[in-house]
C-alpha cells in the first residue's frame, strides 16, 4: 500500500513538473511586415491564412505566409497553441492545394532568424516568432 501511495505521489510530482516546464516556454507571437495595416486577427482568420485558404489581408493586400519546418518545436507550438491544429493537419491542407492545383504551400524558412529577416523584407508577410527574436523590423499582430 505504501508503495502504491509513493508511486502515485511520484506520478503527481512528475505531472506538475511537466506542466511547469511547458508554462516556462516563451509564447509564440504572430508577426507581420511593418507595412501591413492590420493589427489584429481572429483565430479563424489566422487559421484560414496559414491553411492558405485566405490569400489576402482584410484590407485586400496579398499575404505572403512564412513557416518553419514541420518538425521545428516552435512551429508545433504555434500550430497547436495559436491555430488549434496539429502541424500534420496544416501539411495535409497544403499538400491538397498543391496537388489539386488550387493553391501553393507557404514559404519555408529554417530558423527564426531567417523568419524575421524574410518577414521584414517581404511586403504583406506573415509568420511567427518567439519574443526573443522580435525587433523593430517586424510588428506583432494580436489574435483574439
Language model features: what each stretch is:
Residues 1-4:
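N-terminal secretory signal peptides that target proteins for export/translocation
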Residues 23-144:
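Flexible loop/hinge segments at secondary-structure junctions
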Residues 7-17:
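Bacterial N-terminal signal peptides
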Amino acid at each position: 500500500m505504501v508503495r502504491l501511495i509513493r508511486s502515485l505521489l511520484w506520478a503527481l510530482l512528475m505531472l506538475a513538473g511537466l506542466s511547469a516546464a511547458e508554462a516556462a516556454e516563451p509564447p509564440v507571437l504572430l508577426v507581420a511586415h511593418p507595412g501591413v495595416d492590420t493589427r489584429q486577427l481572429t483565430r479563424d482568420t489566422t487559421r484560414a491564412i496559414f491553411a492558405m485558404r485566405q490569400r489576402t489581408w482584410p484590407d485586400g493586400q496579398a499575404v505572403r505566409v512564412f513557416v518553419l519546418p514541420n518538425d521545428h518545436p516552435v512551429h508545433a507550438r504555434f500550430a497547436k497553441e495559436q491555430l488549434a491544429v496539429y502541424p500534420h493537419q496544416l501539411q495535409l491542407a497544403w499538400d491538397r492545394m498543391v496537388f489539386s492545383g488550387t493553391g501553393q504551400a507557404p514559404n519555408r524558412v529554417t530558423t527564426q532568424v531567417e523568419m524575421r529577416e524574410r518577414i521584414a523584407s517581404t511586403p504583406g508577410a506573415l509568420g511567427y516568432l518567439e519574443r526573443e527574436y522580435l525587433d523593430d523590423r517586424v510588428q506583432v499582430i494580436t489574435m483574439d
